[in-house]
A protein has these predicted regions:
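Sparse recognition of residues in long alpha-helices and their boundaries
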Residues: 17, 91-92, 167, 199
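ATP-binding/phosphotransfer module of carbohydrate and carboxylate kinases, centering on a glycine-rich
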Residues: 33-36, 55, 100, 105, ...
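Generic structural "secondary-structure junction" signal
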Residues: 8-9, 16, 22-24, 91-94, ...
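Glycine-rich phosphate-binding loop and adjoining helix at the ATP-binding site
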Residues: 5-58, 178-190
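Glycine/GP-enriched mid-protein hinge/lid loop-to-helix segment characteristic of carbohydrate kinases
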Residues: 26-29, 34-134
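Short glycine-rich anion-binding loops that position phosphate/pyrophosphate groups of nucleotides
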Residues: 4-6, 66-67, 172-173
Length: 226
């Protein structure tokens, strides 16, 4: 199962999930209820696992869903960090003293780059938002341009910090393929060391990447144990 939050796989505990509003929450009851082994993974980590590690042995995955998550692989393996918090890019401060994030802090990247930024004020689906972009709605075009600006800053910072390919995934990542040129131009404006954005990649799965990655990982794990 893929869950938005920091997961202790060994102990089957959600250490922290702002999205679900839980902390130190045991998941072992599911194993007891279902009477079968149940495995858990952070949703962004699972989405990263859906990508081919041979193609992206060293890469960052930006999960641009209702909330912003992230993950990254080194030498084809997920890097989880000392406390399972590696890849929490959504809670890096992007704009000091900026918008309030759902975690309670001000200026988090999530408050500027999550898919909810495009839908919450307009009370519409992402598909409807993108249709208005295509129709030339000036207000929506302005929101989209500001969104790409903030996303470009985040991407540039991650590229400078990690020097890896960056895979754009999640709901927004699934629609970005037609907007890579304007996004790339914005990214290059913030990065004085590179003259192209060939490191920006579209995700392999536009929908349900976390489900694919979770299934792929644990199927491979069990096949190796047979």
């Amino acid at each position: 199962m893929a869950i938005p939050g920091i997961i202790d796989q060994k102990e089957r505990i959600v250490l922290k999930s702002h999205a679900l509003g839980i902390e130190n929450y045991s998941l072992r009851f599911l194993e007891q209820a279902l009477e079968i082994p149940v495995y858990f993974e952070n949703d962004a980590n699972a989405a990263m696992l859906a990508e081919k590690k041979q193609k992206y042995p060293n890469a960052i995955y930006l999960s641009l869903n209702h909330t912003l998550g992230g993950a990254f692989c080194i030498d084809g393996k997920l890097f989880r960090g000392q406390n399972q918090k590696a890849g929490e890019f959504g809670h890096m401060i992007l704009v000091p003293s900026g918008r309030k994030c759902y975690c309670g802090k001000l200026g988090c990247a999530d408050a500027y780059c999550a898919a909810s930024v495009l839908t919450q004020d307009n009370r519409q689906s992402l598909d409807a938002f993108m249709e208005k972009i295509e129709s030339g709605d000036e207000k929506i075009l302005q929101i989209w341009d500001e969104y790409l600006d903030h996303l470009a800053v985040l991407i540039s910072n991650l590229r400078m910090a990690y020097d890896m390919d960056i895979i754009l995934g999640g709901d927004v990542g699934g629609v970005l393929s037609d907007y890579m040129i304007p996004l790339g131009e914005k990214v290059m404006a913030y990065n004085g060391f590179e003259h192209d954005v060939s490191y920006l990649k579209n995700c392999s799965y536009k929908k349900e990447a976390s489900a694919v990655g979770a299934a792929k990982y644990f199927f491979t794990k069990h096949m190796g144990e047979l």
